[in-house]
Amino acid sequence: MAEKRNIFLIGPMGAGKSTIGRHLADELHLEFYDSDQEIEKRTGADIAWIFDLEGEEGFRAREETVINDLTDKQGIVLATGGGSVVSKAVRNRLSARGIVVYLQTTIDKQVARTQRDKRRPLLQKDDPETVLRRLAEERNPMYEDAADYIVDTDEQSARAVANQIIEKINQ
């Protein structure tokens, strides 16, 4: 039997990785995983609490372990955390073990999509837009470098983006 392909979704918070990933997995009959949800499941704690207790460095170490474990599976769609690409080891692992799709979005869309979400520790500041701009400057080159495909998520439904990804990977 042919080996099933893995699809890994990367991009900033608010790009739609989890929502699009569920649609993609459903359409392709693959298992869906969200690295943040998997971390919460394994630790029994939410991301914000892990950040408070262990700092970003402790969280990133957990994230790297979870992504390593999940990318060893076959036939999955994985929505990664927005900061996972900061780790060169994670970027290399994603590239080596599947198809990497960068879900691109604007800062304005990120602000609109994340403004009521209290589960995002990096945005619990007075000026989340400034934080998002700084993160974009830092991470966008890493997303681009790791990506096999880049898909814009701003003006399309999650289902339309999932279908666009399927078209791209089947070309």
Curated annotation (Swiss-Prot):
Stored Gene3D superfamilies: P-loop containing nucleotide triphosphate hydrolases
GO MF term list: ATP binding; magnesium ion binding; shikimate kinase activity
Binding site for Mg(2+): S18
Subcellular location: Cytoplasm
Reactions performed catalytically: shikimate + ATP = 3-phosphoshikimate + ADP + H(+)
Single biological process term from Gene Ontology: amino acid biosynthetic process
Cofactor(s) needed: Mg(2+)
Broad class of the protein's primary localization: cytoplasm
Function, in words: Catalyzes the specific phosphorylation of the 3-hydroxyl group of shikimic acid using ATP as a cosubstrate.
Similarity remark: Belongs to the shikimate kinase family.
Protein name, entry field: Shikimate kinase
Organism encoding this protein: Pseudoalteromonas atlantica (strain T6c / ATCC BAA-1087)
Gene: aroK
